[in-house]
Design a protein with these regions (language model features):
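Binuclear metal-dependent phosphoesterase catalytic core
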Residues: 58-164
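His/acidic metal-ligating clusters that form di-metal
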Residues: 1-67, 155
């Protein structure tokens, strides 16, 4: 979007970019490399990007920009090839799309704190567990570079991320 690029040029910072789909690495937008080149030229004022489309707990740094893939509040989508039952037949008949997910027992959420002077980031974690089987247990392949139980998991890890 040309307007967003123009805004990047005008703003002094600090900037946090929120998007539904990721701007870096696993399952990112189609033109992620092009977007990363634009963002890299403004990395002195961009603290982080934050997205949740992938339902993973993952951080990747590109230059000094922290790209945080935040986990979903309630489940990991596994799709039609991995349909299964995590709850009773009554629940599944009332909510038919739940069979396409690996749900979490408890909702996930986090607090992200940014130090205004250092621009370092602190992420407060929260743990849950799978209701039924995990994506790995039902045979869903994990994207290269991600680990079952680490990035593909029912939690958000506590982290302190230093901006370089």
């Amino acid at each position: 979007d040309i307007t967003a690029i123009e805004q990047l040029k005008k703003l002094d910072g600090p900037i946090i970019i929120l998007s539904h789909q990721g701007l870096a690495e696993q399952w990112s937008i189609d033109n992620a490399k092009e977007i990363q080149e634009i963002l890299k030229s403004h990395q002195d004022k961009i603290i982080m990007t934050l997205n949740g489309h992938n339902h993973i707990d993952h951080i990747i740094k590109i230059g000094s920009i922290i790209n945080f893939h935040i986990n979903s509040a309630s489940y990991k989508w596994v799709g039609g090839d991995h349909r299964h039952k995590s709850y009773s037949d009554t629940i599944h008949s009332k909510f038919p799309y739940i069979e396409y997910t690996c749900p979490y027992k408890d909702p996930l959420y986090t607090t992200v704190t940014i130090n205004p002077s250092s621009k370092n980031i602190e992420i407060k974690g929260i743990m849950s567990e799978w209701v039924g089987k995990s994506p790995a247990q039902i045979g869903q392949e994990i994207h290269p570079g991600l680990s079952d139980g680490k990035e593909v998991c029912p939690h958000i890890r506590t982290r302190r991320v230093k901006r370089s």
